[in-house]
Amino acid sequence: MVQEQFVKDFNERTGNNVQFIAAEYEPNVFLQMVRQKHLENEPEGGKRCTSCFEMRLDIVAEKALELGFDYFGSALTLSPKKNSQLINEIGLDIQKIYDVNYLPSDFKKNNGYKRSVEMCKEYDVYRQCYCGCIFAAKAQGIDLKEQNREAIKFIRNQS
């Protein structure tokens, strides 16, 4: 897997011990949830996003507990388009369900977003221009076929 090789190369270059845990890519689970809750027409940043944050943080908390981690968190707070306060509130609520703590963050503070762009260039990390949600992509006028071609090209160049 490209991600595993990237992490291995990154660790060798930097002397770090970063680990990568891949979650299943199951967009249909999200789409089912959206349909069940009738969230198809919600605006970006509305109830659909809140439900997505809840779903994703629940998955992360469950995995953190399974692996014996003390904390779980989210890189979603890096995006200038995402509500860090809301994400953190959801994480703090979810920690009550699992025996694992949520680590609140707002990575965009102190030029965090700018620094993330710099680091992605420095370490040759692929960045997409939206959160991954098909609704957000459509709202922003993003050509998903073009995004897919760019991602495939990036992956091939890594091999």
Language-model regions, residue ranges each:
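Nucleotide-activated chemistry modules centered on ATP-dependent adenylation/adenylyltransferase
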Residues: M1-S159
